[in-house]
Structure formats: structure tokens, C-alpha cells
Swiss-Prot record:
GO terms for biological process: D-xylose catabolic process. The record marks K76 as: Lowers pKa of active site Tyr. Belongs to the aldo/keto reductase family. It comes from the Eukaryota. Pathway: Carbohydrate metabolism; D-xylose degradation. This is NADPH-dependent D-xylose reductase. It holds the Pfam family Aldo_ket_red. Its EC number is 1.1.1.307. It catalyses: xylitol + NAD(+) = D-xylose + NADH + H(+); xylitol + NADP(+) = D-xylose + NADPH + H(+). The active site is at Y47.
Length: 317
């Protein structure tokens, strides 16, 4: 199953998320994911594993397991590279690390511009802005970064461009000035954080949505996120367990199907070959309206990935 983007390209509705994939096993994991049928790989400069993702992709390409035009390779422009003069530089680094000639989709990771950090000083820079732990920002409006991305589409280095972690008001503002409409919005989305009005607005604008952290707190356990302790893991929630039992599916499959049934794409990750396959097979069944509604009642607007926690950045306030 795929979603037709407003750029005319097809995006698989289930992909493999590269966030937190260990560098030591990453190349093998990506290669194995291609072997079992994954075609979309969602990465980012900030994940620090693009070279390894590229190794896995290129091993599969070299062996003829898949052709480049059958893959949908995604990356994200990090906060430190928003200045238009640094956008192409950052994109070229990503293309070089992945060893691909173009990206299928390149997203602005966050609507936040940090001070530029030269690659030789630290790459990926993460939250480092050149002065210890201090956050230093650059006065770069989103539309300026967007214009630079539009040029990269014109140059053939990117097929589709999009945004990630953007609230509705910023999306509306971007649409007023964009020559090329965002093809995709990527958001944190799970039963504890459903964002129905944002989804309704974005879909009404012809923009596709990819959900990350579909398993909710599960995605943030290893980061020792304080809010993880506030809620029951979704895999153990009675509603999810009961729906999974009824459908003869795993809780993970139910959570992923609940999202794809809303018209969203999903990007789960797993290092386990069996789970890799079962996560991919989530569009061969439907949740009943009743089960769908029961899961939808779990919304408590609980956001785990919030820039307010970094430095009181008001992205979602």
C-alpha cells in the first residue's frame, strides 16, 4: 500500500524508522529489512547513522535485491543547517553518507534554527551550538530555509520536500509563501497523542502525514524520559491487548493499523527479523469501527518529543 504525494510520487504507507538504530548493527538491519520487503527508510542527519544506513541500502542495491527507484529514502535537515547558505552543504553530506544521488523526501526536522556548527567541529552537532551546553539560535525564518529546499528540488537532489514537528499555525504560514507545497508532515502520533485537528487540517491541504513513535512511551523508555513513568505501556494496555486478541494480531500490529486506517504512514523499527515482518503486514486487516473508537478514546494529549523540554522552546505551546 502506498500514499500518492502532492509531488506526484508514491510513498509506501509502512516504512522502517532509523532513529536509535545502533550503528554497530545498522547496516545489517537495513539490509535485512530490504530483504523482508521494506522499501521506505526514514532517517535523519541527527540520528548519526546515515553512513551505516547507506551501507545497508547499497549492499542490497549491489546484490540486485532491489533497484534504487523501488526505494523511498528519507532524511531530515537538522536545526543547525537552516541558514540557506548551509542547506545544500548539509544535503550533500547526507547524500554522500547514504551514497545515493537523490533523496525521495527531505524534511525540515524541527521549525527551530540553531547556530551553524562546521562539520569538522562536530557532526552531527545535536544540541551543540559551538559553546558547551548553551543553546544559540540563528535568526532564520522558516520560509528562507524552505526556499533553499525548493532550489534543491529544482536541482534534482530531492524529489519531495516536507516538514516535521510543525504546529498548524506554522504550516498555514508556510503554505502562504511556499512555491512547492510540503508533500509530507511527520508528527509524533500514538493513542496517547492523536492530534485530530492538526491531522484534519493537514490532510485538507493535500499534505500526507507520517506518524513516528506509534508505540507511544515504548519509543522513549531507553531515553529515560520522565513522562514514560506516568502512563501504562500501550502494549500492556487492556484496550490494545483486547483488540489484538480479537483480531489475532500483535499489539504492535494493532497500533500501526490504527494509524494507517486514519490515512497515515508509519515508520516502526525493530532489530528482530520476525517483528520486522509482522510490522510490515499491518494493512491486510481492518479494525472494526467499534475497536477503532475504543483506541481513539485513549487520547490524553501526552507528548514525549517536546522542544520545551530542551530550552523552553515554544513549538507546541
Amino acid at each position: 500500500m502506498s500514499i500518492t504525494l502532492n509531488s506526484g510520487y508514491e510513498m509506501p504507507s509502512v516504512g522502517f524508522g532509523c532513529w536509535k538504530v545502533d550503528k554497530a548493527t545498522c547496516a545489517d538491519t537495513i539490509y535485512n529489512a530490504i530483504k523482508v520487503g521494506y522499501r521506505l527508510f526514514d532517517g535523519a542527519e541527527d540520528y548519526g547513522n546515515e553512513k551505516e544506513v547507506g551501507e545497508g541500502i547499497n549492499r542490497a542495491l549491489d546484490e540486485g535485491l532491489v533497484a534504487r527507484d523501488e526505494l523511498f529514502v528519507v532524511s531530515k535537515l537538522w536545526n543547525s543547517f537552516h541558514d540557506p547558505k548551509n542547506v545544500e552543504k548539509a544535503l550533500d553530506r547526507t547524500l554522500s553518507d547514504l551514497k545515493v544521488d537523490y533523496l525521495d523526501l527531505f524534511l525540515i526536522h524541527f521549525p527551530i534554527a540553531f547556530k551553524f556548527v562546521p562539520f569538522e567541529e562536530k557532526y552531527p552537532p545535536g544540541f551543540y551550538c559551538g559553546d558547551g551546553d548553551k543553546f544559540i539560535y540563528e535568526g532564520v525564518p522558516i520560509i528562507d530555509t524552505w526556499r533553499a529546499l525548493e532550489k534543491m528540488v529544482e536541482k534534482g537532489k530531492i524529489r519531495s520536500i516536507g516538514i516535521s514537528n510543525f504546529p498548524g499555525a506554522l504550516i498555514q504560514d508556510l503554505l502562504r509563501g511556499a512555491k512547492i507545497k510540503p508533500a509530507v508532515l511527520q508528527i509524533e502520533h500514538h493513542p496517547y497523542l492523536q492530534q485530530p485537528r492538526l491531522i484534519e487540517y493537514v490532510q485538507s491541504q493535500g499534505i500526507a502525514i507520517t506518524a513516528y513513535s506509534s508505540f507511544g512511551p515504548q519509543s522513549f523508555v531507553e531515553l529515560n524520559h520522565p513522562r514514560v513513568k506516568d502512563v501504562k505501556p500501550l502494549f500492556e494496555h487492556d484496550v490494545i491487548k483486547s483488540v489484538a486478541e480479537k483480531a489475532n494480531k500483535t499489539p504492535a500490529q494493532v497500533l500501526l493499523r490504527w494509524a494507517t486506517q486514519r490515512g497515515l504512514a508509519v515508520i516502526p523499527k525493530s532489530n528482530n527479523p520476525d517483528r520486522l515482518l509482522s510490522n510490515l503486514k499491518v494493512n491486510d486487516f481492518d479494525l472494526s469501527q467499534e475497536d477503532f473508537k475504543e483506541i481513539s478514546k485513549l487520547d490524553i494529549e501526552l507528548r514525549f518529543n517536546n522542544p520545551w523540554d530542551w530550552d523552553k522552546i515554544p513549538t507546541f505551546v
